[in-house]
């Protein structure tokens, strides 16, 4: 079989104007970026009828280093729906350069179910991440500049500038810097070293752009006005009296919004079969809320009958955050959940196999092993029950691999129905495109006709502590929460300041339902340690770090960039 990049280059493509014309998008509301991608004006959202399409939310079992094919299934299902005569658009997140050059690689799907051109999808796209990085770092630079000038001018600051002093506490600055790259050396650093003109010396850190609060804001904003208001609410630091200092008070919110004006517009692209895809925003699901944008979903729902969107990692991660954060803020409601499962992924979740990065895969992973698969299906059952908890029907998509036996596929299908899925179907979208996902598409159409009513895990009025406890006990199946002294103090402060009404976004490992990646399958009787709690006032949630979570990843010993190059004709090679 050809490589992903070879399939991408050989796939027939529509010029972006023709793709937009298919969707009845007026030419003046499309802003082309080259031949095969273009921004969609926010005016389009205003001109569309009330959204009448049905949203299908794609999640998965607990992911493994092998990959379960969630993006492949998301794109393949959308193609499959079009294949059976049900108009569909996919909405997915933009890839971060960090994983592209790290271990994971790109996020454009794969095989015959990918976004094309895949090079453009994975590398820069329309520059949204760079714009967001610039806007984020503008706030950081403005904060340090204000700190410097207030200290330099002292009591003369207000008289000389006409500005009120902010009295920034250099030891209580909340806003890091950001970069769209995996770079562990930037996790802890000291800035302002040198002479007096080089700024105030203090500790600082970087987060990856996908973990910036600005990325969450971009994904959750409903329009330009909402974006501007959310940015103004961002808490950048605290003053010497312990009071918050916002981007509005620093007078930088307007300029930050200007930098994000184009980034607020979704990017229209296409799959290998010319199915339309809206690509927008890119918050990670382990260290952010892990879903594509509200604006892209609303546009797509006004343009077509079925919208297939992807939530990051397993149902304990992106799916939970879709319902408890994105749905809660936007009102966007899935008609159906699709859970992606693989035979090899469930074997890996059995806890019986020793799978290590860089080591040969266990033999039983690549040959028929029904007992190991049977044990691993407990993880599938947990995720089905977890998804059903939110009140919508669940279909299991069995993403087929060449090493799967018919007996294993049949066992997995039986386990899905036994655990409460309303249907299951094998998907071969990777090798067959939309035709390989037609059975899955039919199961999804049937599921979308079933009645459903969304149920959230906790009410708005519950305390932040109660929300955390509910997430651990109901969302992860744990026994309770272990708060560090720091987290306990932070929760008390946030409660006293009136932030209890916000939802909670837990940052944790995606490799286990629990906080511990070593706990495979369906762990029980565990407590989740919460090390730190942070307010994201602009995004509209409280961010809790479960264990030693890194918001700036690092490159591994065998990074993907080693294989990426360009030939004499300007063709990129080695990108996956």
Swiss-Prot record:
Its recorded name reads Formate--tetrahydrofolate ligase
Q: Which residues bind ATP?
A: 64-71
InterPro entries named among the record's database cross-references:
Formate_THF_ligase, Formate_THF_ligase_CS, P-loop_NTPase
Q: In which pathway does it act?
A: One-carbon metabolism; tetrahydrofolate interconversion
Q: Which GO terms describe its biological process?
A: tetrahydrofolate interconversion
Q: Enumerate the HAMAP family for this protein.
A: FTHFS
Q: Which reaction does it catalyse?
A: (6S)-5,6,7,8-tetrahydrofolate + formate + ATP = (6R)-10-formyltetrahydrofolate + ADP + phosphate
The UniProt similarity line reads: Belongs to the formate--tetrahydrofolate ligase family.
Query: Where does the signal peptide begin and end?
Result: none
User: Is Ligase among the key words of this record?
Assistant: yes
Give the matching NCBIfam families.
Answer: PRK13505.1, PRK13506.1
């Amino acid at each position: 079989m050809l490589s992903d990049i070879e399939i991408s280059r050989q796939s027939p493509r529509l010029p972006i104007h023709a793709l937009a014309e298919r969707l009845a998008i007026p030419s003046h509301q499309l802003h082309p970026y080259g031949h095969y991608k273009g921004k969609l004006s926010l005016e389009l959202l205003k001109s569309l009828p009330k959204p009448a399409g049905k949203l299908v939310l794609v999640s998965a079992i607990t992911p493994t280093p092998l990959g379960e094919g969630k993006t492949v299934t998301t794109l393949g299902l959308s193609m499959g729906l079009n294949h059976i005569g049900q108009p569909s658009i996919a909405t997915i997140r933009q890839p971060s350069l960090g994983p592209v050059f790290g271990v994971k690689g790109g996020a454009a799907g794969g095989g015959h179910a990918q976004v094309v051109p895949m090079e453009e999808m994975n590398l820069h796209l329309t520059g949204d991440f760079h714009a967001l990085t610039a806007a984020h770092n503008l706030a950081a630079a403005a904060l340090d500049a204000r700190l410097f000038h207030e200290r330099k001018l002292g009591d003369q600051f207000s008289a000389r500038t006409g500005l009120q002093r902010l009295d920034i506490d250099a030891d209580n600055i909340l806003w890091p810097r950001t970069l769209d790259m995996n770079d562990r050396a930037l996790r802890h650093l000291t800035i302002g070293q040198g002479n007096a003109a080089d700024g105030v010396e203090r500790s600082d850190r970087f987060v990856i752009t996908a973990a910036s609060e600005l990325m969450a804001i971009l994904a959750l904003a409903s329009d330009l006005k909402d974006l501007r208001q959310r940015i103004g609410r961002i808490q950048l630091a605290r003053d010497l009296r312990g009071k918050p200092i916002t981007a509005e008070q620093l007078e930088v919110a307007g300029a930050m919004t200007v930098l994000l004006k184009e980034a607020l517009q979704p990017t229209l692209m296409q799959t290998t079969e010319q199915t339309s895809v809206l690509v927008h925003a890119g918050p990670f699901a382990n260290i952010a809320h892990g879903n594509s944008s509200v604006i892209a979903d609303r546009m797509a729902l006004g343009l077509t009958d079925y919208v297939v969107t992807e939530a990051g990692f397993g149902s304990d991660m992106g799916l939970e955050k879709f319902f408890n954060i994105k749905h809660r803020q936007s009102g966007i409601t899935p008609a159906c959940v699709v859970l992606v499962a693989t035979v090899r992924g469930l074997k890996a979740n059995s806890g019986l196999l020793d799978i290590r990065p860089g080591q040969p895969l266990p033999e039983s992973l690549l040959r028929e092993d029904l007992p190991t698969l049977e044990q691993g299906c407990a993880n599938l059952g947990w995720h089905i029950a977890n998804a059903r908890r939110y009140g919508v029907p669940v279909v299991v998509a069995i993403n087929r691999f060449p090493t799967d036996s018919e007996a294993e596929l049949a066992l997995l299908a039986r386990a899905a129905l036994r655990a409460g899925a309303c249907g299951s179907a094998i998907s071969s979208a990777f090798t067959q495109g939309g035709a390989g996902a037609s059975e899955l598409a039919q199961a999804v159409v049937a599921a979308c006709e079933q009645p459903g009513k969304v149920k959230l895990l906790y009410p708005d009025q519950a305390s932040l502590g109660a929300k955390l406890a509910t997430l651990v006990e109901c969302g992860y199946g744990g026994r309770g929460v272990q708060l560090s002294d720091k987290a306990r103090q932070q929760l008390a402060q946030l409660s006293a300041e009136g932030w209890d009404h916000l939802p909670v976004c837990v940052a944790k490992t995606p490799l286990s339902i629990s906080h511990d990646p070593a706990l495979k399958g369906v762990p029980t009787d565990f407590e989740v340690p919460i090390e730190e709690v942070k307010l994201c006032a602009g995004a509209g949630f409280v961010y809790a770090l479960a264990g030693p979570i890194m918001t700036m990843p690092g490159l591994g010993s065998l990074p993907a960039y080693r294989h990426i190059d360009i030939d004499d004709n300007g063709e990129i090679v080695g990108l996956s």
